Amino acid sequence: MNQFERFQEAIKLENPENNKFIVNPDTNYFVGNTPHGGYLMAIMHKALTSILPHSTSISSSVQYLDRIDAKPFELEVEEFKISSGSSSGIVKLKQNNKICTTFTGTCSDFEHMKGYDYLEKTLPDIFKDRQKKDYVKMNYDKISKGFTPAFIQQLQCSIHPDHAWWNRDSQFNHDNEARCSAFLEMDGGVPDQ
């Protein structure tokens, strides 16, 4: 199973009952002993778009109110407004009988919109001065051993040799501009929304 399939499995929601879901969070998407905020946002977006008639959040806001433990929690979806072109609602994440996080979103049907897609932009000139094979593979443990979450380590990151800061010697000119030119890749193809 590739990373995209694993993530889809990690945010999978089943059988809503009265607009409520019980979620057993996947610890592969934790920072320490608590779920990563982006992971929670993805689950809450999924809950909202599972209940509302529109499939994509076009505007959203998340409030992280209290710590979430590594145990099951409840998502409760409340509809605010439903019309032909958009709908909105709120998702409340509850654990230990208190609201820990809220996600408010307005949704629409972007898959029916027409317009530009996959616009190509040329790479900056710095990508032309070295071949990709010369780029330095990110060593997550050398940077912060044991700190980088597992879900970040799934990312294959190759950094331009001039920007691999962990390999610089003490004679490096620290007055240079901060830059990080890199290739970021993940197995599994183009992600969904």
Question: Which role does the model predict for each range below?
Answer:
Residues 1-193:
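Terminal targeting signals and extreme-terminal segments of soluble enzymes
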